[in-house]
Amino acid sequence: MTFNPSKKLYISDVTLRDGSHAIRHQYTLDDVRAIARALDKAKVDSIEVAHGDGLQGSSFNYGFGRHTDLEYIEAVAGEISHAQIATLLLPGIGSVHDLKNAYQAGARVVRVATHCTEADVSKQHIEYARNLGMDTVGFLMMSHMIPAEKLAEQGKLMESYGATCIYMADSGGAMSMNDIRDRMRAFKAVLKPETQVGMHAHHNLSLGVANSIVAVEEGCDRVDASLAGMGAGAGNAPLEVFIAVAERLGWNHGTDLYTLMDAADDIVRPLQDRPVRVDRETLGLGYAGVYSSFLRHAEIAAAKYNLKTLDILVELGHRRMVGGQEDMIVDVALDLLAAHKENRA
Protein backbone atom coordinates (compact mmCIF):
# COMPACT_ATOMS: atom_id res chain seq x y z
CA MET A 1 0.00 0.00 0.00
CA THR A 2 1.25 3.48 -0.92
CA PHE A 3 0.77 6.07 1.81
CA ASN A 4 -0.96 9.24 0.62
CA PRO A 5 -0.10 12.19 2.92
CA SER A 6 -2.59 14.47 1.15
CA LYS A 7 -5.57 12.26 2.05
CA LYS A 8 -7.88 14.02 4.51
CA LEU A 9 -7.62 12.40 7.93
CA TYR A 10 -10.80 12.03 9.94
CA ILE A 11 -10.09 13.52 13.38
CA SER A 12 -12.26 11.97 16.09
CA ASP A 13 -12.15 13.71 19.46
CA VAL A 14 -12.93 11.61 22.55
CA THR A 15 -12.44 14.21 25.31
CA LEU A 16 -16.13 14.14 26.25
CA ARG A 17 -16.38 10.34 26.42
CA ASP A 18 -13.05 8.63 27.23
CA GLY A 19 -11.99 11.83 28.98
CA SER A 20 -14.85 11.34 31.40
CA HIS A 21 -12.92 8.47 33.04
CA ALA A 22 -10.22 10.90 34.16
CA ILE A 23 -12.65 12.82 36.37
CA ARG A 24 -14.92 9.93 37.35
CA HIS A 25 -17.61 11.03 34.88
CA GLN A 26 -18.22 14.38 36.59
CA TYR A 27 -18.23 16.87 33.70
CA THR A 28 -20.70 19.70 34.20
CA LEU A 29 -22.90 20.80 31.32
CA ASP A 30 -20.95 24.06 31.19
CA ASP A 31 -17.73 22.02 30.88
CA VAL A 32 -19.01 20.05 27.91
CA ARG A 33 -20.37 23.14 26.20
CA ALA A 34 -17.04 24.97 26.51
CA ILE A 35 -15.06 21.96 25.26
CA ALA A 36 -17.48 21.35 22.39
CA ARG A 37 -17.30 24.99 21.27
CA ALA A 38 -13.51 24.87 21.17
CA LEU A 39 -13.42 21.56 19.29
CA ASP A 40 -15.98 22.77 16.77
CA LYS A 41 -14.01 25.99 16.26
CA ALA A 42 -10.90 23.87 15.63
CA LYS A 43 -12.83 21.89 12.99
CA VAL A 44 -12.49 18.34 14.29
CA ASP A 45 -14.68 15.91 12.37
CA SER A 46 -16.51 14.33 15.30
CA ILE A 47 -16.94 14.83 19.03
CA GLU A 48 -17.74 11.68 20.99
CA VAL A 49 -20.16 12.25 23.87
CA ALA A 50 -21.24 9.71 26.50
CA HIS A 51 -20.41 8.30 29.89
CA GLY A 52 -16.87 6.92 29.80
CA ASP A 53 -18.27 3.40 29.46
CA GLY A 54 -20.70 4.40 26.75
CA LEU A 55 -24.45 4.89 26.66
CA GLN A 56 -26.03 3.87 29.97
CA GLY A 57 -22.61 3.35 31.54
CA SER A 58 -23.69 5.45 34.52
CA SER A 59 -24.10 2.72 37.14
CA PHE A 60 -22.80 1.32 40.41
CA ASN A 61 -20.35 -0.91 38.53
CA TYR A 62 -18.76 1.79 36.37
CA GLY A 63 -19.45 4.95 38.34
CA PHE A 64 -22.38 7.33 38.22
CA GLY A 65 -22.23 10.30 35.87
CA ARG A 66 -23.11 13.81 36.99
CA HIS A 67 -25.60 14.06 34.10
CA THR A 68 -27.27 11.62 31.74
CA ASP A 69 -25.90 10.78 28.31
CA LEU A 70 -28.81 12.56 26.66
CA GLU A 71 -28.24 15.72 28.69
CA TYR A 72 -24.61 15.76 27.56
CA ILE A 73 -25.48 15.07 23.91
CA GLU A 74 -28.17 17.76 23.84
CA ALA A 75 -25.78 20.26 25.45
CA VAL A 76 -23.16 19.62 22.76
CA ALA A 77 -25.74 19.67 19.95
CA GLY A 78 -26.62 23.23 20.89
CA GLU A 79 -23.01 24.42 20.52
CA ILE A 80 -21.68 22.97 17.26
CA SER A 81 -22.10 23.68 13.57
CA HIS A 82 -19.24 21.76 11.93
CA ALA A 83 -18.49 18.55 13.83
CA GLN A 84 -20.77 15.55 14.06
CA ILE A 85 -21.72 14.13 17.44
CA ALA A 86 -20.48 10.60 17.98
CA THR A 87 -21.32 8.25 20.81
CA LEU A 88 -20.16 4.87 22.10
CA LEU A 89 -22.30 1.83 22.81
CA LEU A 90 -21.19 -1.40 24.48
CA PRO A 91 -23.75 -4.18 23.87
CA GLY A 92 -24.96 -5.37 27.25
CA ILE A 93 -24.56 -1.93 28.80
CA GLY A 94 -26.42 0.16 26.24
CA SER A 95 -29.35 -1.05 24.13
CA VAL A 96 -30.81 -0.21 20.73
CA HIS A 97 -33.42 1.83 22.63
CA ASP A 98 -30.62 3.96 24.09
CA LEU A 99 -29.09 4.30 20.64
CA LYS A 100 -32.38 5.55 19.20
CA ASN A 101 -32.64 8.13 21.97
CA ALA A 102 -29.06 9.28 21.35
CA TYR A 103 -29.82 9.64 17.64
CA GLN A 104 -32.91 11.72 18.40
CA ALA A 105 -30.81 13.91 20.72
CA GLY A 106 -28.30 14.62 17.94
CA ALA A 107 -25.77 11.76 17.66
CA ARG A 108 -24.97 10.83 14.07
CA VAL A 109 -21.95 8.54 14.56
CA VAL A 110 -21.93 5.45 16.77
CA ARG A 111 -19.03 3.22 17.68
CA VAL A 112 -20.30 -0.20 18.73
CA ALA A 113 -17.63 -1.52 21.08
CA THR A 114 -16.90 -5.08 22.13
CA HIS A 115 -13.98 -6.97 23.61
CA CYS A 116 -11.64 -7.97 20.79
CA THR A 117 -12.90 -11.58 20.73
CA GLU A 118 -16.62 -10.81 20.99
CA ALA A 119 -17.54 -9.05 17.75
CA ASP A 120 -20.51 -11.38 17.34
CA VAL A 121 -22.44 -9.58 20.10
CA SER A 122 -22.43 -6.36 18.03
CA LYS A 123 -24.66 -7.62 15.20
CA GLN A 124 -28.01 -6.30 16.44
CA HIS A 125 -26.63 -2.90 17.37
CA ILE A 126 -24.65 -2.38 14.15
CA GLU A 127 -27.64 -3.37 12.01
CA TYR A 128 -29.94 -1.08 13.99
CA ALA A 129 -27.53 1.85 13.67
CA ARG A 130 -27.29 1.37 9.91
CA ASN A 131 -31.08 1.33 9.67
CA LEU A 132 -31.15 4.65 11.53
CA GLY A 133 -28.77 6.04 8.93
CA MET A 134 -25.90 6.52 11.36
CA ASP A 135 -22.19 6.45 10.50
CA THR A 136 -21.61 3.01 12.03
CA VAL A 137 -18.24 1.95 13.40
CA GLY A 138 -17.10 -1.38 14.86
CA PHE A 139 -14.75 -0.82 17.81
CA LEU A 140 -12.56 -3.71 19.01
CA MET A 141 -11.29 -3.09 22.54
CA MET A 142 -8.16 -4.52 24.19
CA SER A 143 -6.78 -5.28 20.73
CA HIS A 144 -3.39 -6.27 22.12
CA MET A 145 -4.81 -9.47 23.59
CA ILE A 146 -5.11 -11.50 20.37
CA PRO A 147 -2.89 -11.94 17.29
CA ALA A 148 -3.30 -9.60 14.33
CA GLU A 149 -4.97 -12.18 12.09
CA LYS A 150 -7.55 -13.09 14.76
CA LEU A 151 -8.30 -9.40 15.32
CA ALA A 152 -8.84 -8.93 11.59
CA GLU A 153 -11.31 -11.84 11.58
CA GLN A 154 -13.31 -10.08 14.28
CA GLY A 155 -13.24 -6.87 12.27
CA LYS A 156 -14.47 -8.78 9.23
CA LEU A 157 -17.45 -9.96 11.28
CA MET A 158 -18.35 -6.38 12.22
CA GLU A 159 -18.00 -5.39 8.57
CA SER A 160 -20.39 -8.20 7.58
CA TYR A 161 -22.99 -6.80 9.99
CA GLY A 162 -22.81 -3.40 8.28
CA ALA A 163 -20.01 -1.45 9.98
CA THR A 164 -18.33 0.87 7.46
CA CYS A 165 -15.28 1.52 9.65
CA ILE A 166 -13.40 -0.86 11.95
CA TYR A 167 -11.35 0.44 14.88
CA MET A 168 -8.40 -1.08 16.64
CA ALA A 169 -8.60 0.12 20.25
CA ASP A 170 -5.43 -0.22 22.33
CA SER A 171 -7.49 0.03 25.51
CA GLY A 172 -4.58 -1.02 27.72
CA GLY A 173 -2.07 1.28 26.06
CA ALA A 174 0.06 -1.85 25.77
CA MET A 175 1.03 -1.97 22.10
CA SER A 176 4.24 -1.03 20.34
CA MET A 177 4.56 0.42 16.85
CA ASN A 178 5.18 -3.04 15.36
CA ASP A 179 2.00 -4.30 17.01
CA ILE A 180 0.09 -1.49 15.31
CA ARG A 181 1.67 -2.17 11.92
CA ASP A 182 0.83 -5.88 12.09
CA ARG A 183 -2.80 -5.28 12.99
CA MET A 184 -3.37 -2.50 10.47
CA ARG A 185 -1.90 -4.67 7.71
CA ALA A 186 -4.08 -7.60 8.80
CA PHE A 187 -7.18 -5.38 8.64
CA LYS A 188 -6.26 -4.14 5.18
CA ALA A 189 -5.72 -7.70 3.97
CA VAL A 190 -9.27 -8.86 4.76
CA LEU A 191 -11.57 -5.82 4.80
CA LYS A 192 -13.24 -4.41 1.70
CA PRO A 193 -11.31 -1.55 0.07
CA GLU A 194 -14.14 0.86 0.88
CA THR A 195 -14.22 -0.07 4.59
CA GLN A 196 -12.32 2.47 6.64
CA VAL A 197 -10.06 1.63 9.58
CA GLY A 198 -9.47 3.63 12.74
CA MET A 199 -6.96 3.88 15.59
CA HIS A 200 -7.77 4.49 19.26
CA ALA A 201 -4.57 4.78 21.30
CA HIS A 202 -3.82 5.08 25.00
CA HIS A 203 -0.66 6.71 26.27
CA ASN A 204 0.32 4.33 29.11
CA LEU A 205 3.68 3.52 27.49
CA SER A 206 4.02 7.08 26.10
CA LEU A 207 3.36 5.66 22.62
CA GLY A 208 -0.12 7.07 21.97
CA VAL A 209 1.02 9.61 19.38
CA ALA A 210 3.71 7.39 17.86
CA ASN A 211 1.26 4.51 17.46
CA SER A 212 -1.31 6.82 15.85
CA ILE A 213 1.30 8.11 13.40
CA VAL A 214 2.29 4.55 12.45
CA ALA A 215 -1.38 3.63 12.01
CA VAL A 216 -1.86 6.48 9.55
CA GLU A 217 1.27 5.47 7.65
CA GLU A 218 -0.30 2.00 7.33
CA GLY A 219 -3.50 3.40 5.82
CA CYS A 220 -5.59 4.31 8.87
CA ASP A 221 -8.45 6.67 7.95
CA ARG A 222 -9.67 7.85 11.36
CA VAL A 223 -7.68 8.78 14.45
CA ASP A 224 -9.01 9.16 18.00
CA ALA A 225 -7.38 11.67 20.32
CA SER A 226 -8.34 13.95 23.20
CA LEU A 227 -7.45 17.40 24.44
CA ALA A 228 -4.52 17.20 26.88
CA GLY A 229 -4.80 13.42 26.47
CA MET A 230 -7.89 13.49 28.71
CA GLY A 231 -8.84 9.84 29.08
CA ALA A 232 -8.55 6.64 31.07
CA GLY A 233 -5.17 5.65 32.48
CA ALA A 234 -2.41 7.91 31.16
CA GLY A 235 -4.99 9.19 28.72
CA ASN A 236 -5.44 8.96 25.00
CA ALA A 237 -3.13 10.28 22.32
CA PRO A 238 -3.09 14.03 23.13
CA LEU A 239 -4.99 15.65 20.27
CA GLU A 240 -2.94 18.83 20.12
CA VAL A 241 0.30 16.82 20.07
CA PHE A 242 -0.90 14.49 17.32
CA ILE A 243 -2.02 17.45 15.22
CA ALA A 244 1.31 19.23 15.75
CA VAL A 245 3.16 16.16 14.48
CA ALA A 246 0.73 15.72 11.57
CA GLU A 247 1.26 19.38 10.68
CA ARG A 248 5.04 18.97 10.68
CA LEU A 249 4.66 15.91 8.46
CA GLY A 250 2.55 17.87 6.00
CA TRP A 251 -0.56 15.73 6.49
CA ASN A 252 -4.05 16.96 5.66
CA HIS A 253 -5.87 17.05 9.01
CA GLY A 254 -8.07 20.11 8.53
CA THR A 255 -7.92 21.35 12.12
CA ASP A 256 -6.54 24.45 13.83
CA LEU A 257 -3.58 23.55 16.05
CA TYR A 258 -3.53 26.72 18.15
CA THR A 259 -7.22 26.49 19.03
CA LEU A 260 -6.60 22.94 20.24
CA MET A 261 -3.53 23.96 22.25
CA ASP A 262 -5.47 26.74 23.98
CA ALA A 263 -8.41 24.45 24.76
CA ALA A 264 -6.13 21.76 26.19
CA ASP A 265 -4.37 24.11 28.61
CA ASP A 266 -7.10 26.65 29.37
CA ILE A 267 -10.21 24.45 29.55
CA VAL A 268 -9.38 20.77 29.96
CA ARG A 269 -6.25 20.49 32.09
CA PRO A 270 -7.72 22.55 34.97
CA LEU A 271 -10.54 19.98 35.30
CA GLN A 272 -8.19 17.12 36.20
CA ASP A 273 -8.38 16.12 39.87
CA ARG A 274 -5.65 13.54 39.16
CA PRO A 275 -3.03 14.48 36.55
CA VAL A 276 -3.48 12.56 33.31
CA ARG A 277 0.10 11.42 32.78
CA VAL A 278 2.47 8.48 32.69
CA ASP A 279 3.34 7.65 36.30
CA ARG A 280 3.93 4.50 38.34
CA GLU A 281 0.31 3.40 38.21
CA THR A 282 -0.53 4.29 34.63
CA LEU A 283 2.74 2.83 33.39
CA GLY A 284 1.71 -0.34 35.21
CA LEU A 285 -1.46 -0.44 33.10
CA GLY A 286 0.50 -0.44 29.87
CA TYR A 287 3.19 -2.79 31.12
CA ALA A 288 0.66 -5.34 32.40
CA GLY A 289 -1.81 -4.82 29.53
CA VAL A 290 -4.69 -3.78 31.79
CA TYR A 291 -7.88 -1.99 30.71
CA SER A 292 -7.11 1.69 31.25
CA SER A 293 -10.38 2.62 32.93
CA PHE A 294 -9.55 0.22 35.79
CA LEU A 295 -7.16 2.86 37.16
CA ARG A 296 -9.51 4.96 39.28
CA HIS A 297 -11.37 1.89 40.55
CA ALA A 298 -8.09 0.24 41.57
CA GLU A 299 -6.97 3.41 43.36
CA ILE A 300 -10.16 3.38 45.43
CA ALA A 301 -9.70 -0.30 46.32
CA ALA A 302 -6.04 0.26 47.22
CA ALA A 303 -6.93 3.11 49.57
CA LYS A 304 -9.70 1.08 51.20
CA TYR A 305 -7.55 -2.00 51.87
CA ASN A 306 -4.19 -0.29 52.40
CA LEU A 307 -2.62 -1.86 49.31
CA LYS A 308 -0.51 -0.54 46.45
CA THR A 309 -2.51 0.37 43.36
CA LEU A 310 0.28 -0.99 41.18
CA ASP A 311 0.06 -4.42 42.84
CA ILE A 312 -3.67 -4.59 42.11
CA LEU A 313 -3.18 -3.55 38.49
CA VAL A 314 -0.40 -6.05 37.84
CA GLU A 315 -2.49 -8.86 39.32
CA LEU A 316 -5.43 -7.84 37.12
CA GLY A 317 -3.07 -8.16 34.17
CA HIS A 318 -1.93 -11.61 35.29
CA ARG A 319 -5.57 -12.68 35.43
CA ARG A 320 -6.27 -11.17 31.99
CA MET A 321 -9.24 -9.19 33.24
CA VAL A 322 -11.06 -7.17 30.58
CA GLY A 323 -13.49 -4.28 30.35
CA GLY A 324 -16.72 -5.06 32.17
CA GLN A 325 -15.00 -6.90 35.01
CA GLU A 326 -14.62 -3.85 37.22
CA ASP A 327 -16.40 -5.74 40.00
CA MET A 328 -13.43 -8.13 40.14
CA ILE A 329 -11.06 -5.37 41.24
CA VAL A 330 -12.28 -5.65 44.83
CA ASP A 331 -11.96 -9.45 44.66
CA VAL A 332 -8.34 -9.09 43.55
CA ALA A 333 -7.70 -6.60 46.34
CA LEU A 334 -9.13 -8.97 48.93
CA ASP A 335 -7.01 -11.85 47.59
CA LEU A 336 -3.88 -9.69 47.83
CA LEU A 337 -4.83 -8.62 51.35
CA ALA A 338 -5.30 -12.24 52.41
CA ALA A 339 -1.94 -13.17 50.87
CA HIS A 340 -0.22 -10.33 52.74
CA LYS A 341 -1.75 -11.45 56.04
CA GLU A 342 -0.69 -15.04 55.39
CA ASN A 343 2.87 -13.95 54.63
CA ARG A 344 3.01 -12.01 57.90
CA ALA A 345 1.69 -14.96 59.92
Swiss-Prot record:
Gene3D superfamilies: 1.10.8.60, Aldolase class I (3.20.20.70)
Swiss-Prot/TrEMBL GO biological process terms: benzoate catabolic process via hydroxylation; L-leucine biosynthetic process; phenol-containing compound catabolic process
Disulfide bond residue pairs: none
Residue ranges constituting the Pyruvate carboxyltransferase domain according to the UniProt record: 9-261
Keyword Signal: no
Binding site for substrate: R17, D18, S171, H200, Y291
Keyword set, alphabetical order: Aromatic hydrocarbons catabolism, Lyase, Manganese, Metal-binding, Plasmid
Record site feature (Transition state stabilizer), residues: R17
Modulation of this protein's activity: Six- to eight-fold activated by Mn(2+). Retains residual activity after EDTA treatment in vitro. Also activated by NADH and, to a lesser extent, by NAD(+). Strongly inhibited by Zn(2+). Mg(2+) and Ca(2+) have no effect on enzymatic activity.
SUPFAM superfamilies, A to Z: Aldolase (SSF51569), post-HMGL domain-like (SSF89000)
Catalytic activity: (S)-4-hydroxy-2-oxopentanoate = acetaldehyde + pyruvate
Name of protein: 4-hydroxy-2-oxovalerate aldolase
Organism, as annotated: Pseudomonas sp. (strain CF600)
Gene: dmpG
